[in-house]
Swiss-Prot record:
The modification N6-acetyllysine is found at residue 104. The keyword Signal does not apply. Keywords: Acetylation. SUPFAM superfamilies: Adenine nucleotide alpha hydrolases-like (SSF52402). The lineage of its organism: Bacteria, Bacillati, Actinomycetota, Actinomycetes, Mycobacteriales. This is Universal stress protein MSMEG_4207. Acetylated on Lys-104 by PatA in the presence of acetyl-CoA as an acetyl donor.
Length: 130
């Protein structure tokens, strides 16, 4: 299983695209996780129902078996790391942003923790043009 950390932006969409490619390459399924620690109504990265429908339609068209999870009130990093503890999990795919010098120092707490703590390979991707 390929686990994708999805955010409702071009970086999340790039992660889904690469996740689909990897799932096809490995002949496995896809688990897409879009989690928020706060209120879903104020978290811009949390996908709204229309966005989830679009992702779901795209995944159905891909032919890859998939599941979408949208836990609310949880730490996104912990949710992804827990998913990666599954014996079926092979690869974690996340979208990553280009950062300014200060941002590079910090990397982004979610991406940094995932890269450092994930027990299995992590593929960090950017959308074309970023």
């Amino acid at each position: 299983m390929i686990v994708v950390g999805y955010s409702a932006d071009p970086f999340g969409r790039a992660a889904v695209e690469h996740g689909i490619e990897e799932a096809k390459r490995r002949d496995t399924g896809l688990l897409v996780i879009n989690a928020t620690a706060g209120d879903a109504y104020v978290d811009a990265r949390f996908a709204r129902s229309g966005e989830v429908h679009d992702v779901e339609a795209h995944l159905q068209d891909s032919g890859v078996p998939f599941e979408i999870r949208q836990p609310v009130g949880v730490d996104a990093t912990e949710e992804l790391l827990t998913a990666m503890d599954s014996p079926d999990a092979e690869l974690l795919v996340i979208g990553i942003r280009h950062r300014n010098p200060v941002g590079k120092l910090l990397l982004g707490s979610v991406a940094q923790r995932l890269l450092l703590e994930c027990p299995k390979p992590v593929l960090a991707v950017k959308p074309h043009g970023f």
